[in-house]
Amino acid sequence: MGVNEYLLVGLGNPGREYQDTRHNAGSLLLDDLSSRWSGSNSIEKYNSTFRKARVAGNSLALMQPLTYMNRSGLAVAEYVRFFKIVAENIIVIHDDIDMAPGRVKLVRGGGAGGHNGIKSINSSLGFVDYYRLKIGVGRPGKHGIHPEIPVDKYVLAPFSAEQLDIIVGRYDAIAAGLETFFRDSPAAAATVLNSLR
C-alpha cells in the first residue's frame, strides 16, 4: 500500500455489555465516522471488524479490534503488517481519563499513560510514533466526578447522559478535524481538534 493508505482504529471492548462505557469512547466515535464516510460493508478479519472508505482522496480503513482492550495490539499489528501501513498513517482513537469529558487532543507518539490498549499496541507494533486521538472522559475526583469511584470501575461504567451529550456533541467538529488531517496535514488537524475543550 502506498503513502495515501490510512488506518483509523477505535479502541473499546467487544460485546454489548461494554458498548456505551467510557472505555469504549474510541469505538463509539468510530461507529459515527463509519456511518459518515463508509459505503462498504463491514469485513471481519485480522482479529477486527473494519470498513473501507475514501476521505479527501485517500483510502482509509476504519477498524474496531475484536480483542479485549488489553490485547488490542494483536489486531492492529496484524493489519499494519499485512498492509504495510506506515506509522504516520495510523490514528488510534481512545479514551483519556486525564482530560475533561469532551476535550479532544491529537498527539503523535508518547507513552501509554496507563492505558492498557495503547500499551498493547505499542508493544505489538514495536514503535510508538503513530497518531492518537484522545477523547476526554474525566477522572474520579476531578471534572465534577465523585472521588470515591475506583478508576477501573469508572471507565467500565456507562457514560452519564450529560457526558455522552457533551462527547457526541463534538462529533461533527471531530469529523471535520480528521478530514483536515487527510486533506491538509496533521498540524492543521491538530489546530482544529486540540481547540475542542
Swiss-Prot record:
Residues of the active site: H23
InterPro entries, per the entry: Pept_tRNA_hydro, Pept_tRNA_hydro_CS, Pept_tRNA_hydro_sf
Record localization: Cytoplasm
Residues marked Discriminates between blocked and unblocked aminoacyl-tRNA (site): N13
Catalytic activity: an N-acyl-L-alpha-aminoacyl-tRNA + H2O = an N-acyl-L-amino acid + a tRNA + H(+)
A family per Pfam: Pept_tRNA_hydro
Any one GO CC term of the record: cytoplasm
Record-level Gene Ontology MF annotations: peptidyl-tRNA hydrolase activity; tRNA binding
GO biological process: protein quality control for misfolded or incompletely synthesized proteins; rescue of stalled ribosome
Keywords: Cytoplasm, Hydrolase, RNA-binding, tRNA-binding
Residues at the site labelled Stabilizes the basic form of H active site to accept a proton: D95
E.C. numbers: 3.1.1.29
Binding site for tRNA: Y18, Y68, N70, N116
Complexes and interactors: Monomer.
Function: Hydrolyzes ribosome-free peptidyl-tRNAs (with 1 or more amino acids incorporated), which drop off the ribosome during protein synthesis, or as a result of ribosome stalling. Catalyzes the release of premature peptidyl moieties from peptidyl-tRNA molecules trapped in stalled 50S ribosomal subunits, and thus maintains levels of free tRNAs and 50S ribosomes.
Family of this protein: Belongs to the PTH family.
Official protein name in the record: Peptidyl-tRNA hydrolase
Gene: pth
